[in-house]
């Protein structure tokens, strides 16, 4: 489990928050559970390194607030529209037994042992993330789809995914598709329109008499030369 150090934040104005960011820190807040919301600050450099690892918003982390560890789930990150740098972060307290909604990434493995992919098949991914409802202590890091032995024409539906007890997709009532393995697309040369074929045939008919006329002219020219 990843960890992140945080400190209690006592900012009271926008100027205080700007000064905080200028010093390389990111303001945030912890909410949820029986405790009150708490303002915090984290080091931007450390936060960005965790974000770059991927699936940051889908994994519980240990937040060491003023040296005291607590489990939280990163819920939302606000970014600067120009620099794309993080400017604020929300953390949700993890309370055992309490169910939450969370998007979990879909990961595909064993591409190299799929006969369908070896024959040029195309993996069409319909959903790269799936929203689940689950207890905070049972959040899966990812939904894994095994492509081993999968051939062209096969598909993966949510019913084929084994989830822990108490973990369910938020979409209910239908067995939605996650991905399919389709046949390779072959580009065919467009057929010549019937009108174009008819015009080509007419051009051929017109060219034939002209050729015969040229042949006749050549014969007459040769006979004249012999008389001379």
UniProtKB/Swiss-Prot annotation:
Keywords, comma-separated and alphabetical: Ribonucleoprotein, Ribosomal protein, RNA-binding, rRNA-binding
Protein's UniProt name: Large ribosomal subunit protein bL25
HAMAP family tied to this protein: Ribosomal_bL25_CTC
Basic and acidic residues composition-biased segments: 202-228
Extent of Polar residues compositional bias: 1-10
Name of one Pfam family that matches: Ribosomal_TL5_C
Record-level GO BP terms: translation
Source species of the chain: Pelagibacter ubique (strain HTCC1062)
Family the UniProt entry places it in: Belongs to the bacterial ribosomal protein bL25 family. CTC subfamily.
Keyword rRNA-binding recorded: yes
Gene3D superfamilies to which the protein is assigned, alphabetical: Ribosomal protein L25, beta domain, Ribosomal Protein L25, Chain P
InterPro entries the UniProt entry points to: Rbsml_bL25/Gln-tRNA_synth_N, Ribosomal_bL25/Gln-tRNA_synth, Ribosomal_bL25_b-dom, Ribosomal_bL25_C, Ribosomal_bL25_long, Ribosomal_L25_dom, Ribosomal_uL5_bac-type
Region described as Disordered: 1-20, 187-228
Subunit structure: Part of the 50S ribosomal subunit; part of the 5S rRNA/L5/L18/L25 subcomplex. Contacts the 5S rRNA. Binds to the 5S rRNA independently of L5 and L18.
Gene Ontology terms for molecular function: 5S rRNA binding; structural constituent of ribosome
């Amino acid at each position: 489990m990843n960890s992140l150090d945080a400190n209690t934040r006592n900012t009271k104005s926008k100027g205080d928050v700007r000064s905080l960011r200028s010093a390389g820190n990111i303001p945030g807040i912890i909410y949820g559970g029986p405790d009150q919301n708490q303002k915090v600050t984290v080091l931007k450099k450390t936060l960005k390194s965790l974000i770059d690892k991927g699936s940051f918003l889908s994994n519980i982390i240990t937040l060491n607030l003023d040296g005291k560890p607590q489990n939280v789930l990163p819920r939302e990150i606000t970014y600067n529209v120009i620099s794309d740098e993080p400017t604020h972060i929300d953390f949700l307290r993890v309370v055992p037994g309490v169910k939450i909604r969370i998007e979990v990434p879909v990961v595909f493995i064993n591409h190299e042992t799929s006969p369908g992919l070896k024959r040029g098949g195309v993996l069409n991914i319909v959903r790269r993330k799936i929203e689940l409802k689950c207890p905070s202590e049972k959040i899966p890091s990812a939904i894994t789809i095994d492509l081993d032995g999968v051939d062209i024409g096969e598909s993966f539906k949510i019913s084929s995914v084994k989830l822990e007890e108490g973990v369910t997709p938020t979409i209910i009532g239908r067995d939605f598709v996650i991905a399919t393995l389709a046949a390779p697309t072959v580009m065919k040369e467009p057929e010549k329109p019937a009108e174009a074929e008819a015009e080509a045939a007419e051009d051929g008919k017109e060219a034939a008499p002209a050729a015969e006329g040229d042949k006749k002219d050549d014969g007459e020219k040769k006979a004249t030369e012999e008389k001379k």
